[in-house]
Amino acid sequence: MAIQHPDIQPAVNHSVQVAIAGAGPVGLMMANYLGQMGIDVLVVEKLDKLIDYPRAIGIDDEALRTMQSVGLVDNVLPHTTPWHAMRFLTPKGRCFADIQPMTDEFGWPRRNAFIQPQVDAVMLEGLSRFPNVRCLFSRELEAFSQQDDEVTLHLKTEEGQRETVKAQWLVACDGGASFVRRTLNVPFEGKTAPNQWIVVDIANDPLSTPHIYLCCDPVRPYVSAALPHAVRRFEFMVMPGETEEQLREPQNMRKLLSKVLPNPDNVELIRQRVYTHNARLAQRFRIDRVLLAGDAAHIMPVWQGQGYNSGMRDAFNLAWKLALVIQGKARDALLDTYQQERRDHAKAMIDLSVTAGNVLAPPKRWQGTLRDGVSWLLNYLPPVKRYFLEMRFKPMPQYYGGALVREGEAKHSPVGKMFIQPKVTLENGDVTLLDNAIGANFAVIGWGCNPLWGMSDEQIQQWRALGTRFIQVVPEVQIHTAQDNHDGVLRVGDTQGRLRSWFAQHNASLVVMRPDRFVAATAIPQTLGKTLNKLASVMTLTRPDADVSVEKVA
């Protein structure tokens, strides 16, 4: 598809494997992952620097695991507040829903507050590790065109200079108003909320109470959130007839803050900004050699803090697939599984966010009264209370089709779900999280068994070419048993007993884990070879010259 562009001779030409439009969190994460895989990447950003004001304030365990996968989590954690509870309050201040999950099944706290600009800066700095990755600011994408084997981008600098980029693939991470998506005429279906909200960020937190509170005041609903580094965020609904200019006036801002602070004059304002909450989903995530990710593919209200995290899921799902395709290890049909796996879950998170917004600010007054009464009764039912406390209402990513092989009923299968990340003990005695032992790779993990036993030599060659790590998990007391060592297999001890419980629950002894930490397949030693062949087929992996044997049997 050709797009018209200015007929001006470009002054600079770039040639890369992947061009990324947008240096927001999703674009930066994509660039970090592809960079560590050796892919030649160019990130282009219209602005002259990263956005420096707070935006998203919630980062979950899955997103922290994604940060871990690119070696940045230790630099991100200082800008987070772990175990950040969310509490819904009635107009009288009674907590009717306390969301405070204490699980760390994926290695990190499930709910965390964070300062997005500082985390974005960590990701930008992370790109300096890779000589194959560049990030250019003050570059406006004016036009682009797709050919059979490449995408051509036409850029303009602040000085009016033109530049051309030739890339094998274009990943559009250019936000909810995505130029790329609009140019390709991809429908962005959904709705815009009728109410706006004004966000007020304050330094030297004048409240300094922990957690986040959503106060369901029928007169003017508001949010109060404690953020890292002594930042307090307030969000107030903008009422009909009010404008941003009016609310920003000192006397009106004072009136707003007097609702939540005893002394609204003694504050250090960082910024005030009005937001409109949208709930929209792109009809397609892949258009030939262009892929949409993050807000360019879906936008949602902020009430569950899942806009940022959904973008991180996009980046993790897409990046490893794109790397395999560029490296010639898989055909580009693998990229079709990106939309197949991500779009339905993005829609589920949009629906959850819209529902949470309706709980905070019901469209009709009687709905708020009903909410308060029903919630008061339900809080006396322990199963209901645990349902909210443990955040069980959050739709966990589960893929029913795509780059995976499932045997049996999907409902109870671990295939298509994220694998746990407990602590494990290495043979040198060090204790670490499982992903640290695996790296940014596929893994075949076996409980007690040699994971190579059920594979032919050709299969071992094929999966090692993907960087696959072969892991044998044993009870921690067996970690130093020499006779159980196998060449090419990493042995780890089950420090917390969680891996034993996982394998026992799912009636399997082997799991194939994808680089994004999702379970691609389960097996036992005698069926592993057959399962790996099926998985190689659905992932359209390229094969060695020799025919791959089906499986090894006793």
Curated annotation (Swiss-Prot):
Keywords: Aromatic hydrocarbons catabolism, FAD, Flavoprotein, NAD, Oxidoreductase. It comes from the Bacteria. Its cofactor is FAD. InterPro entries: 3-HPP/3HCI_hydroxylase (IPR023786), FAD-bd (IPR002938), FAD/NAD-bd_sf (IPR036188), PheA/TfdB_FAD_monoxygenase (IPR050631). The keyword NAD applies. Catalyzes the insertion of one atom of molecular oxygen into position 2 of the phenyl ring of 3-(3-hydroxyphenyl)propionate (3-HPP) and hydroxycinnamic acid (3HCI). GO terms for biological process: 3-(3-hydroxy)phenylpropionate catabolic process; 3-phenylpropionate catabolic process. It catalyses: 3-(3-hydroxyphenyl)propanoate + NADH + O2 + H(+) = 3-(2,3-dihydroxyphenyl)propanoate + NAD(+) + H2O; (2E)-3-(3-hydroxyphenyl)prop-2-enoate + NADH + O2 + H(+) = (2E)-3-(2,3-dihydroxyphenyl)prop-2-enoate + NAD(+) + H2O. Disulfide bonds: none annotated. This is 3-(3-hydroxy-phenyl)propionate/3-hydroxycinnamic acid hydroxylase. The gene is mhpA. One of its GO terms (molecular function) is 3-(3-hydroxyphenyl)propionate hydroxylase activity. The lineage of its organism: Bacteria, Pseudomonadati, Pseudomonadota, Gammaproteobacteria, Enterobacterales. NCBIfam families: PRK06183.1-1 (NF004827), PRK06183.1-3 (NF004829), PRK06183.1-5 (NF004831). Its EC number is 1.14.13.127. FAD binds at residues 17-46, 285-295. Belongs to the PheA/TfdB FAD monooxygenase family. Pathway: Aromatic compound metabolism; 3-phenylpropanoate degradation.
